[in-house]
Amino acid sequence: MKKIGLLFLLIGTFFSCQKKEDSYLEDPYKGKLKVTYVEEAKGWVKNIALHNEDLYFIRQDPFIGKIDSKGNTSSVTVTKSDNFNFNNDGSSVALSDSGDVYYTKGLLGPHKIFKYTPSTQQTTEIEVNYTPSYFGGREGILALTRYNSNEFMFFDFYSKTIKRYFHNLGTIVDVMGSGRDEISDGTGINASFRGIFQMAVFGKDIYVIDGKNSIRKIEPEGTSFKVTTLLKNYPETINDLAIDDDGVIYVVAHNQGILKFNPTTNKLEDYLSGKYIELKTPKSGLGYIDVDFDVDVISIKGKDMYLAFSTTLIKIANFKEEIAKYLLERERK
């Protein structure tokens, strides 16, 4: 009788284990956030930019790297053009249609834009003329961002102005900014800024983080641009923002994961947060990656989301679908 009982116990255990294994084989990502890749940048990531299916990242040491759409990092070095450390707020990277890499060195960097041409492996410097503000001092060129195929936008911290760089023509012109160190709305030179560290473009509109805790919208108005403050004096540091194809604004703030901006209430709402997020990639086999989800940088292209925190780079393909699945499973636990 004891032998029969033991036999049923073993059979039950077998089918229980088999059921768990079958459940895993049916959906190996169950309860985990499915991501395309999790890659180490081997240095602190300060900013990212997308070109075609490739992710470019600017590191602090100095280094600009590239990861392809599948997470291959076998050839990541783009340039080590000088020994200047990028460990500054506002250091940025952007690309032209031809694949030329433009970058700036942030708040404490020189008053220049740098251009790296992969075909020649040469770096050239573009001088930005000084226009002292009322609070001139720090030189930095911040938040260089591709505006369209012909031009970039950036923030000149020294003059407290936003400028346009027409890279095909080699000309730089002022867009807006009074030069005063304050947050005030208006058009052209009637608007004022404290310090723009990140920009994101949606159509012809630009969304910026000003003073590290305010979100502002810049939109064309006639021959000039108008700025409107959407969110002011958020209690935590806002690290970055991105806009999806539907115009939804996603924000990453210190220790708060990913937030969404609600235009009806003008408030940030939780989207994906948590002290630890369990990530699973096609490479991770039976295991998963448990990460401290304090995001520094975010970018969106089409249905894909790209994140960076500390030295880690992440791509989430079909991010809305995958995050919705993950949140539903998390609620059921």
Where are these regions (language model features)?
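Bacterial Sec-dependent N-terminal signal peptides
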Residues: M1-K42, N52
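Beta-strand-rich domains and repeat architectures in extracellular enzymes and scaffolds
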Residues: V38-P62
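Short loop/turn segments immediately following the C-termini of beta-strands
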Residues: R59-D61, K105-L108, D156-Y158, D210-K212, ...
